[in-house]
């Protein structure tokens, strides 16, 4: 479960999104991050219930997204992110699709993603989609997948046309245009803070595991 204090911290940060406020509430920030790290450790410890590769990878619960934005990319946005994320995979972060939990007031979800892949990882995933399109379509149309992720595959960003080397008429063009992708199974704040959160997350991860395995082929 995620502690209610973690949700409350994210809400407070949204209302007081300044460097001075964060500096004055550093202990609350560290407690919120530590809360998600504890949850991440439990998810890794139970990985044999959804992905044996994760279970065998010897991971640590240390894969939290940085909470602060890079000032080079602010463009008028608040200085700090108001979400906390767990992300873990069985390899390099930018090379392999992994499982994730996103905790943000009013927008909590779980699934799998590689929203900002390295160029080689993106090229590899595009090649998989282009050359094994039928297999890909079977994975994302499977009943457990559709039930868990009614919005299907979501793009982090996408090209306006086909990537170099691919036809705009390719049957997988919708996915080939994606520059990063993920799935989202929506969760309420009540569900995120409930004692049975991990038991709720396991079937979500099991539903997306075939996608994870497919997109990590050759990684």
Model-identified regions with their sequence ranges:
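Phosphate-proximal small/polar/acidic motifs at interfaces that engage nucleotide phosphates
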Residues: 22
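Alpha-helical scaffold domains
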Residues: 55-56, 82, 177
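Aromatic- and glycine-enriched beta-alpha-beta binding-site module
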Residues: 70-131
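Compact, glycine/acidic-enriched structural inserts
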Residues: 104-161, 165
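Soluble extramembrane domains of integral membrane proteins
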Residues: 60-89, 98, 138-156
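Long, solvent-exposed, polar/charged low-complexity segments
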Residues: 2-15, 19, 36-44, 141-142, ...
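Gly/Pro-rich turn-and-neighbor structural signature
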Residues: 30-76
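Short histidine-centered catalytic/ligand-binding loop motif
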Residues: 25-32, 114, 125-129, 193, ...
């Amino acid at each position: 479960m995620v502690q209610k204090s973690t949700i409350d911290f994210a809400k407070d940060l949204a209302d007081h999104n300044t460097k001075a406020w964060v500096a004055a509430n550093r202990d609350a920030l560290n407690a919120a991050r530590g809360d998600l790290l504890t949850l991440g450790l439990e998810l890794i410890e139970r990985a044999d219930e959804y992905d044996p590769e994760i279970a065998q990878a010897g991971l640590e619960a240390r894969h939290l997204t940085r909470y602060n934005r890079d000032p080079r990319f602010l463009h008028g946005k608040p200085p700090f992110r108001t979400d906390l994320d767990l992300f873990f995979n069985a390899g390099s972060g930018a090379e392999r699709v992994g499982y994730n939990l996103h905790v943000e007031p009013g927008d909590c979800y779980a699934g799998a993603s590689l929203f900002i892949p390295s160029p080689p990882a993106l090229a590899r995933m595009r090649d998989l989609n282009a050359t094994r399109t039928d297999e890909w379509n079977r994975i994302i149309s499977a009943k457990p997948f559709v039930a868990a992720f009614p919005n299907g595959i979501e793009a982090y960003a996408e090209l306006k046309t086909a990537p170099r080397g691919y036809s705009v008429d390719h049957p997988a063009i919708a996915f080939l245009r994606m520059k990063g992708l993920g799935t989202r199974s929506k969760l309420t704040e009540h569900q995120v803070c409930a004692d049975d959160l991990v038991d709720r997350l396991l079937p979500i991860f099991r539903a997306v595991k075939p996608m994870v395995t497919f997109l990590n082929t050759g990684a």
